[in-house]
């Protein structure tokens, strides 16, 4: 690693996680330096980010858009395009850590190249482990690479696991807000509109992840991610609904102790921890005021109304190519819903049908 500030490349800097990452960099500018950023569709924002941070490399991942992309005010910035450009960025010698924040399976190739190059990975792209978990974790082991979770739930588990040994873990408990429809009946779920699904009560996320949260497919994918990231069997992974999103996940040990990580629902904290690890820094994330009364509820999930959770458990247990199949089916189904071709309840039903046909 270079001396001085840690050099960061952000894959997906224009998305929700990417923007929050840059908020952390602004607050920790003496410790972090942006070497490269990538964007796909929001090129106006990508230009503004490049002008502010003056990275060595800016990548437009859509080659067609890259052909007409003009970047003013950045004389020292090289503009690259496509997946090849992403791979060139993450393999630069001066990159210390890669924030993998491209949404969906599109994030796998750049993350894979970064691991092969020996870069520390701050992983926000859960689809990397959903689609290729055993392969990615084996590659990281072979290359001596740390994969540090950015998902708030997996960051919480990662931190709580530091307090014990693997054989002492009874289970990990992923918390879920339950999404905007946690109190909806099955009949009301059939009438959910696109606008309804995009109105998440707690987190500010992009449209695909927001829909995943509403169907609870996001939590299903997190079950699979936890399976591979922490090397856990499926019987040691549980989910509870926690609407306040203050307890981000828990680890229960064999003596009955439960260790939880708590903070307001602000993605800047797990992002910063992944970039500061193994240290902790002052940062921009909101803090809990323990002098103000608050309450925390925990409820068992309803598998009948939210069957995506069952798909997550099934895929985590089956392994093989099932994760890639589920992820592809879900990406297609969510796109169909957002385009008005599928009803909300048909998203998970379509995924179920695809898995049924998968050998």
Descriptions of predicted regions:
Residues 1-359:
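Catalytic, metal-anchored helix/loop core of enzyme active sites in primary metabolism
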């Amino acid at each position: 690693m270079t001396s001085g500030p840690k050099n960061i490349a952000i894959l997906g800097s224009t998305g929700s996680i990417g923007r929050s990452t840059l908020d952390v960099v602004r607050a920790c500018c003496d410790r972090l330096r942006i070497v490269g950023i990538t964007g796909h569709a929001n090129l106006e924002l990508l230009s503004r980010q490049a002008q502010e941070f003056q990275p060595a490399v800016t990548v437009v991942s859509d080659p067609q858009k890259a052909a007409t992309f003009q970047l003013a005010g950045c004389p020292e910035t090289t503009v690259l395009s496509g997946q090849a450009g992403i791979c060139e960025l993450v393999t630069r010698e001066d990159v210390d850590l890669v924030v993998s924040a491209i949404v969906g399976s599109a994030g796998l190739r750049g993350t894979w190249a970064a691991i092969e190059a020996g870069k520390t990975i701050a992983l926000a792209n859960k689809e990397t482990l959903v689609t290729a978990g055993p392969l990615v974790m084996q590659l990281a082991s072979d290359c001596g690479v740390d994969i540090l979770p950015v998902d708030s739930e997996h960051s919480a588990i990662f931190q709580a696991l530091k307090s014990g040994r693997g054989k002492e873990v009874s289970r990990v408990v992923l918390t879920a807000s339950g999404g905007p429809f946690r109190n909806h009946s099955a009949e009301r779920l059939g009438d959910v509109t696109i606008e309804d699904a995009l109105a998440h009560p707690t987190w500010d996320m992009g449209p695909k992840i927001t829909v995943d949260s509403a169907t609870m497919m996001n939590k299903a994918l997190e079950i699979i991610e936890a399976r591979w990231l922490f090397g856990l069997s499926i019987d040691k992974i549980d989910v509870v609904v926690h609407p306040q999103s203050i307890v981000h996940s828990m680890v229960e040990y064999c003596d009955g102790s439960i260790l939880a990580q708590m903070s307001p629902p602000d993605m800047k904290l797990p992002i910063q921890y992944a970039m500061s690890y193994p240290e902790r820094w002052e940062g921009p994330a909101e803090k809990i005021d323990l002098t103000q009364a608050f309450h925390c509820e925990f409820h068992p999930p309803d598998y009948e109304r939210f069957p995506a959770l069952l798909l997550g458990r099934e895929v985590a247990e089956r392994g093989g190519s099932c994760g890639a199949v589920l992820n592809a089916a879900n990406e297609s189904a969510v796109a169909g819903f957002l385009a008005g071709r599928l009803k909300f309840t048909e998203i998970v039903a379509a995924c179920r049908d695809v898995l049924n046909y998968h050998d």
